[in-house]
């Protein structure tokens, strides 16, 4: 499976798709309000992670922070320079059952 040319979905694409889904349900909501909700959602996700909260969407997946140990003599791939990396946290996503099942049979 080649991952170099996968289609990319942007936040604008998500806003447009939500807008289409709402129009198909015969409701009206302007894109600017949908964008506000999507922006607020991602901001809340980020803020919750920064507070070291675990964010769980049942059957979809869980976002959490994981601690990475620091290393000595890590190499900067752009410059080749050796640097020390302190302990730090990274965002981690663990997919839920429905998401795993949904993507299991995708052929690439």
From Swiss-Prot:
Superkingdom of origin: Bacteria
Keyword Amino-acid biosynthesis: no
GO molecular function list: DNA binding; structural constituent of chromatin
A Pfam short name: Bac_DNA_binding
GO annotation, biological process: chromosome condensation
Annotated GO CC locations: cytosol
Coiled-coil stretches: none
Keywords: DNA condensation, DNA-binding
Function: Histone-like DNA-binding protein which is capable of wrapping DNA to stabilize it, and thus to prevent its denaturation under extreme environmental conditions.
Similarity field: Belongs to the bacterial histone-like protein family.
The protein's name in its UniProt record: DNA-binding protein HBbu
Gene source species: Borrelia parkeri
Gene that this sequence comes from: hbb
């Amino acid at each position: 499976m080649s991952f170099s040319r996968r289609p990319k979905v942007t936040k604008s694409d998500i806003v447009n798709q939500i807008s289409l889904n709402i129009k198909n349900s015969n409701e009206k909501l302007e894109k600017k309000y949908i964008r506000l909700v999507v922006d607020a959602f991602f901001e809340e996700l980020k803020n919750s992670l920064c507070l070291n909260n675990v964010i769980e969407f049942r059957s979809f997946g869980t976002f959490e922070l994981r601690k990475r140990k620091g290393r000595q003599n890590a190499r900067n791939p752009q410059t080749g320079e050796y640097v020390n990396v302190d302990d730090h946290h990274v965002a981690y996503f663990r997919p839920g059952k429905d998401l795993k099942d949904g993507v299991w049979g995708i052929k690439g």
